[in-house]
Amino acid sequence: MARMYYDTDANLDLLAGKTIAIIGYGSQGHAHALNLKDSGINVIVGLYPGSKSAKKAEEAGLKVLSVAEAAQAADWIMILLPDEVQKAVYTHEIAPYLSEGKVLCFAHGFNIHFGQVVPPPTVDVVMIAPKGPGHLVRRTYEQGEGVPCLFAVYQDATGQARDRAMAYAKGIGGTRAGILETTFREETETDLFGEQVVLCGGLSALIKGGFETLVNAGYQPELAYFECLHEVKLIVDLIVEGGLAKMRDSISNTAEYGDLTRGPRIVTDETRAEMKKILREIQTGQFAREFVLENQSGKPGFTAMRRQEAEHPIEEVGKDLRAMFSWLKDK
């Protein structure tokens, strides 16, 4: 079993007297900034001119600067921007101010692992990655708890990089729940694999495939939506709470028997071979190169795929059905 580290393993004093710049104030950015602030750390926020998030950050009591100003003023710089914009922002607004001994932080290893960002050898480069969305990172912190985090060291220029990463994780509440040490390579490759094969790519393809099969067989689209999309949350909640065992213990015997006898016919040896192929594309950097080139060319293919997916019948059916769900109206 991997070792977990907790509050007593991390030294928050390493952040004392330091200024941490949070670059970006989205889902993760606001949670990191506010949690660190509430942990007694001096936090500033770096945003581009005209950012709609500036007012929110200022109303929360945070000092907002341009990205370049924040990078220049900070001892620690946490980049919480979309993967595809990090290289340009780093190159033009952060790199010129990375003086010796500073700490460059990430919450995902994509740009470091695939060589899009190449820091100077005189700075620590670390990763602190909460395994939950920003609103959960913030809410659990306020409740005196936390969200588990991954942490990693890519470059240790000061001899303190590992301790510094753990201190940051403590500052955002991660060590209350437990933090797990990894590497930039492992985090990046497993994260991309999970997104593509299971959580996003695999699940959305499975949902659409099931929906289309029922509709093409003459069943009402609304029933197909309920059975193949809506009830996914009911099952996933059980799995998150207690693993596959709790899910199977909570469903009917009919459903469990169907799971055990028919499920393996969906994920076949051919499917597993494709999973291995996708993993290899991630490991070799093929996916990263494809994604970077797509963004550099203005995202024509990405935009077309988004448009095509938005026009899928499941979206129209879902929109009408969700209007009936009173528990969603407040959201």
Curated annotation (Swiss-Prot):
Q: Entry's InterPro entries?
A: 6-PGluconate_DH-like_C_sf (IPR008927), KARI (IPR013023), KARI_C (IPR000506), KARI_N (IPR013116), KARI_prok (IPR014359), NAD(P)-bd_dom_sf (IPR036291)
Q: What residues sit in the active site? A: H108
- Keyword field: Amino-acid biosynthesis, Branched-chain amino acid biosynthesis, Magnesium, Metal-binding, NADP, Oxidoreductase
Keyword check for Magnesium, yes or no. yes
EC code: 1.1.1.86
Q: Which pathway does it take part in?
A: Amino-acid biosynthesis; L-isoleucine biosynthesis; L-isoleucine from 2-oxobutanoate: step 2/4; Amino-acid biosynthesis; L-valine biosynthesis; L-valine from pyruvate: step 2/4
Annotated positions binding Mg(2+) 1: D191, E195
Annotated KARI N-terminal Rossmann domain residues: 2-182
Task: Tell me which residues make up the KARI C-terminal knotted domain.
Answer: 183-328
Q: Which cofactor does it need?
A: Mg(2+)
Q: Where does NADP(+) bind?
A: Y25, G26, S27, Q28, S51, S53, D83, E84, V85, Q86, G134
Bound cofactor: record note: Binds 2 magnesium ions per subunit.
Binding-site residues, substrate: S252
Which top-level enzyme class is recorded in the Swiss-Prot or TrEMBL entry?
Answer: oxidoreductase
One annotated GO molecular function? magnesium ion binding
What reaction is this protein's catalytic activity? (2R)-2,3-dihydroxy-3-methylbutanoate + NADP(+) = (2S)-2-acetolactate + NADPH + H(+); (2R,3R)-2,3-dihydroxy-3-methylpentanoate + NADP(+) = (S)-2-ethyl-2-hydroxy-3-oxobutanoate + NADPH + H(+)
Instruction: List the PROSITE patterns hit by this protein, alphabetically.
Output: KARI_C (PS51851), KARI_N (PS51850)
The cellular component terms of Gene Ontology attached to this UniProt record, alphabetical and capped at eight, are: cytosol
Which BP terms in the Gene Ontology apply to this protein?
isoleucine biosynthetic process; L-valine biosynthetic process
Q: Which HAMAP family did the record assign?
A: IlvC (MF_00435)
Q: Which family does it belong to?
A: Belongs to the ketol-acid reductoisomerase family.
Reported function = Involved in the biosynthesis of branched-chain amino acids (BCAA). Catalyzes an alkyl-migration followed by a ketol-acid reduction of (S)-2-acetolactate (S2AL) to yield (R)-2,3-dihydroxy-isovalerate. In the isomerase reaction, S2AL is rearranged via a Mg-dependent methyl migration to produce 3-hydroxy-3-methyl-2-ketobutyrate (HMKB). In the reductase reaction, this 2-ketoacid undergoes a metal-dependent reduction by NADPH to yield (R)-2,3-dihydroxy-isovalerate.
Instruction: Please report the name of this protein according to its UniProt entry.
Output: Ketol-acid reductoisomerase (NADP(+))
Q: Which organism is it from?
A: Rippkaea orientalis (strain PCC 8801 / RF-1) (Cyanothece sp. (strain PCC 8801))
Q: Which gene encodes it?
A: ilvC
